[in-house]
Amino acid sequence: MRAKDIRAKAGDEPITMLTAYDAPTAEIAEAAGVDVLLVGDSVGNTRLGYDSTLPVTVDEMASHTAAVARATDDALVVADMPFLSFGADEADAVDNCGRMLKEADADAVKLECGPHTVSLTKTLSDLGIPVQAHLGLTPQRENETGLYRQGTDEESANRILELAREHEAAGAFSLVLEHVPANLAASVTDALSIPTIGIGAGPDCDGQVLVVDEVVGLAEGTAPFSKRFGDVRGEMREAIEAYTDAVDSGSFPGDEHSHYEDDIEDIY
């Protein structure tokens, strides 16, 4: 799968996208039919113990992206560019994004976008680095906007639509729309020739993306626009409790889990 293959799905077949942060998750998700694996900066608060995505570094993203890429054969691997890895200096941004393809074997990068990323999107696209744009709620700007629904009034909705058009013209191959009204997402989808992938953006986008921890039930809670499809957290706790109980009771390890050599004499 390449960026051009995802772009070709616009208005055709639904796109499934899911976060992945490690090789086992990537392998399972790809086997389950996921089209796009997003190595999200949400690795910060799902795997690394941070309170938000803001502390995540380029090195951390490269490491997790490489792990996902090593376990992936067909799905498109998209590396999320972390806070302050782009936007201030274009040359630095190109270097950081280039690392994700050269060192981590990603297929594309995702940028949380605004007016400042239109030029960068064109530069990256011209250099052969596929860009997935991200508009609406952009968590890296939480200190400015808060983690609230975006595009809820005419002015902000028009701004999102215009930025979507500008990033498409700059070369973005797809667009993530997060936590925006469903009717706005539908309008943006109709206005673009590249696919839109929604998260909390209603049913009319070309695809959907969710955080894997929420999908499988590993997270303690879920976003209001997400859905749990399993209870991995409960199953993990049950299995670990069974293990600790077995060790405490002396029932593990048993003879079937132990190996003895008849020709070794008692050393005592």
From Swiss-Prot:
Residues holding 3-methyl-2-oxobutanoate: 41-42, 80, 110
Keyword Cytoplasm: yes
Pathway annotation: Cofactor biosynthesis; coenzyme A biosynthesis
One Gene Ontology MF term: 3-methyl-2-oxobutanoate hydroxymethyltransferase activity
Domain of life: Archaea
Cofactor: binding details: Binds 1 Mg(2+) ion per subunit.
Binding of Mg(2+), residues: 41, 80, 112
Reactions it catalyzes: 3-methyl-2-oxobutanoate + (6R)-5,10-methylene-5,6,7,8-tetrahydrofolate + H2O = 2-dehydropantoate + (6S)-5,6,7,8-tetrahydrofolate
Keyword Metal-binding: yes
PANTHER family the UniProt entry points to: 3-METHYL-2-OXOBUTANOATE HYDROXYMETHYLTRANSFERASE (PTHR20881:SF0)
Reported function: Catalyzes the reversible reaction in which hydroxymethyl group from 5,10-methylenetetrahydrofolate is transferred onto alpha-ketoisovalerate to form ketopantoate.
Subunit structure: Homodecamer; pentamer of dimers.
Protein name: 3-methyl-2-oxobutanoate hydroxymethyltransferase
Provenance organism: Natronomonas pharaonis (strain ATCC 35678 / DSM 2160 / CIP 103997 / JCM 8858 / NBRC 14720 / NCIMB 2260 / Gabara)
Encoding gene per record: panB
